[in-house]
Amino acid sequence: MVNIGLSKVDDAIVAKHPGLQQYVACQSYAFMKGTASFILGTVGIFFGQRALQKIIKYPLQWNLFVSIVSSSVFSYSVTRWETMKCSDVWLFLETGNIPDRNSDKEEPETSADSTTTQHEDVLE
């Protein structure tokens, strides 16, 4: 048995997915990085607003509101970015290919034969 967080994963599953422990460690790091960015962002923006409050007067509740909302957006973007990197590592460890997120989507090919559907079903 292998511990992943609070749950235990069977050895057969770990053997089937060799990159599982690296992926879980990467995800844990991504979530901790997002949490840290939320806390540090809130504190930094709050004290930055307190310094600006000498110039622009507005109530403390708006300081808290703006700090929390902007830090939430920042934290979400950091966590999302790190999670995408973890997903890329997982796909690389599972398939051996590096996923290309910048490739253009190919349009589906239209067949010249109108008697077959896109699922290769023949119409009579």
From Swiss-Prot:
Question: For this UniProt entry, which segments traverse the membrane?
Answer: 29-48, 60-78
**Which cell locations does it reside in?**
Membrane
Which cysteine-cysteine pairs are annotated as disulfide bonds in the entry? none
Residues spanning the signal sequence: none
InterPro entries (alphabetical)? Tmem141, Tmem141_sf
According to its record, how does it sit in the membrane? Answer: Multi-pass membrane protein
An example of a Pfam family matching this protein is: TMEM141
The answer to whether UniProt assigns keyword Phosphoprotein to this entry is no
Write down the superkingdom of origin: Eukaryota
Record's keyword terms, sorted:
Membrane, Transmembrane, Transmembrane helix
Q: Name one GO cellular component term.
A: membrane
Where in this protein does the record put region Disordered? Answer: 97-124
Please report which protein family the annotation says this sequence is part of: Belongs to the TMEM141 family.
Q: Which PANTHER family is this protein grouped with?
A: TRANSMEMBRANE PROTEIN 141
Q: What name does the UniProt record give this protein?
A: Transmembrane protein 141
Q: What is the lineage of its organism?
A: Eukaryota, Metazoa, Chordata, Craniata, Vertebrata
Gene name, per UniProt, is tmem141
